[in-house]
């Protein structure tokens, strides 16, 4: 609702346009939470495969479907899914598999104590090459903020949610 993921997706589009290998990794949302940005980036990945324009796109869902509105409904706990997802991303970073990584809602597993912040920071600081990592979410750990190149805080001034309106197709997803 505040634009954190949408802003990061804009950066992913820029990376794609430069021919970078783009990976989007959703750490809280499940595969059932379908957003327009996913369709757009997948279509751009397909365009790359067919024409060579832009770069390849990877989209992976690491979350179990847990949300603030309902409990998780997967065989794997949200904590285990976050740890497994981070291990996967760490391996991709170590092997320079991508040029641009969007770790969507990745601050939450750190804030909730599901991931070791020191280990995450060490992995990011020591990643090889010139890989770019964008992390979204609130409550970023101070250690992460200190090593980041850019930190942005999205602040809602006014939103239709405030007057009881539900999310709108085309606006929130």
Predicted regions mapped to residue ranges:
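Phosphate-binding/switch loop-helix module in NTP-utilizing enzymes
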Residues: 68-132
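Conserved nucleotide-binding/hydrolysis micro-motifs of P-loop NTPases
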Residues: 28-32, 65-67, 107-108, 139-142, ...
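Phosphate-binding/switch region of NTP-binding enzymes
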Residues: 138-173
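Hydrophobic/aromatic ligand-binding patch that stacks against planar heteroaromatic rings
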Residues: 14, 40, 123, 143-144
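Structural signal for conserved beta-strand scaffold positions within catalytic alpha/beta enzyme cores
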Residues: 58-61, 135, 152-153
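Conserved P-loop
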Residues: 2-94
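Short, glycine/charged-enriched secondary-structure capping and boundary segments
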Residues: 11, 37-41, 115-119, 147-151, ...
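Structured helix-beta-strand junction loops
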Residues: 44-47, 130, 147
